[in-house]
Curated annotation (Swiss-Prot):
This is Large ribosomal subunit protein bL27. NCBIfam families: L27. GO terms for molecular function: structural constituent of ribosome. Belongs to the bacterial ribosomal protein bL27 family. It comes from Protochlamydia amoebophila (strain UWE25). Pfam families: Ribosomal_L27 (PF01016). Signal peptide: none annotated. Keywords: Ribonucleoprotein, Ribosomal protein.
């Protein structure tokens, strides 16, 4: 007879890598065109003036300027330019 029991197997032991979602710049920060503002799944934050939305719902700056957040029923992110 064996002196040790068999090890068996488990169905656990795997986990996905974190996706680093969330806000990347705060309100009042100066950004350049093309800068990523938010990484998200779905539209927790919505694009407003001078902000674009990627196919994965990422929000990015379309113009140089200052980031501004506005909340009504939804939270909107816009870029205020100097002009």
């Amino acid at each position: 007879m064996a002196h040790k029991k068999g090890q068996g197997s488990t169905r656990n032991g795997r986990d996905s890598h974190s996706k680093r979602l969330g806000i990347k710049v705060g309100s009042g920060e100066v950004v350049r065109a093309g800068s990523i503002l938010v990484r998200q799944r779905g539209t927790k934050w919505h694009p407003a003036k001078n902000v674009g939305r990627g196919t994965d719902d990422t929000l990015f700056a379309l113009a140089d300027g200052v980031v501004a957040f506005r909340k009504s029923n939804k939270t909107y992110i816009s870029i205020e330019t100097g002009a």
